């Protein structure tokens, strides 16, 4: 016996439906599409969200909120992510080089999450009170 001789046991697998292939299949003639109408035609589909002329749900509900443009150029960095930066000086550019933040980020804030493993000098980056205390306790310092 070889792999090409293997076949499933008789009756264990059902044949797939082939619409429009004879009356005996149960899906002959109209192929399960019903009789006349838009959806019986080839290419006959309605647009997603179309509700037959009734005001669609996405137009019945009010608009709300907006996308803050500030969120696009600001980022938060955890204390544990500072270890990914090579060298002892951490700047916005060094965080970008270490792929910690996106290239379009301009302002960064360090959050108290994780631990500082070494003493680092932070230049031009804001930090929360807890993060500032943790960095200074590890022997690091802040420069504006």
UniProtKB/Swiss-Prot annotation:
Family (UniProt): Belongs to the universal ribosomal protein uL15 family.
GO cellular component terms, A-Z: cytosolic large ribosomal subunit
MF annotations from Gene Ontology: rRNA binding; structural constituent of ribosome
SUPFAM superfamilies in the record: Ribosomal proteins L15p and L18e (SSF52080)
Name of the featured protein: Large ribosomal subunit protein uL15
Species in which this protein is naturally found: Pseudomonas fluorescens (strain ATCC BAA-477 / NRRL B-23932 / Pf-5)
Entry keywords, A to Z: Ribonucleoprotein, Ribosomal protein, RNA-binding, rRNA-binding
InterPro entries hit by this protein: Ribosomal_uL15, Ribosomal_uL15/eL18, Ribosomal_uL15/eL18_sf, Ribosomal_uL15_bac-type, Ribosomal_uL15_CS
GO biological process, one term: translation
Assembly and interaction partners: Part of the 50S ribosomal subunit.
Function as written in the Swiss-Prot or TrEMBL entry: Binds to the 23S rRNA.
Composition skew (Gly residues), residue ranges: 21-31
Lyase among keywords: no
């Amino acid at each position: 016996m070889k792999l090409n001789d293997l076949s499933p046991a008789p009756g264990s697998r059902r044949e797939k439906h082939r619409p429009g292939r004879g009356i005996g299949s149960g899906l002959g003639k109209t192929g399960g599409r019903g009789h006349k109408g838009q959806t019986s035609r080839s290419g006959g589909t309605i647009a997603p969200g179309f509700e037959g002329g009734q005001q669609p749900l996405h137009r019945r509900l009010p608009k709300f909120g907006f996308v803050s443009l500030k969120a696009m150029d600001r980022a938060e960095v955890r204390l544990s992510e500072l270890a990914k930066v090579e060298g002892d000086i951490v700047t916005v550019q060094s965080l970008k080089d270490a792929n910690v933040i996106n290239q379009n980020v301009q302002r960064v804030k360090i959050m108290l999450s994780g631990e500082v493993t070494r003493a680092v000098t932070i230049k031009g980056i804001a930090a929360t009170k807890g993060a500032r205390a943790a960095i200074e306790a590890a022997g690091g310092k802040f420069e504006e």
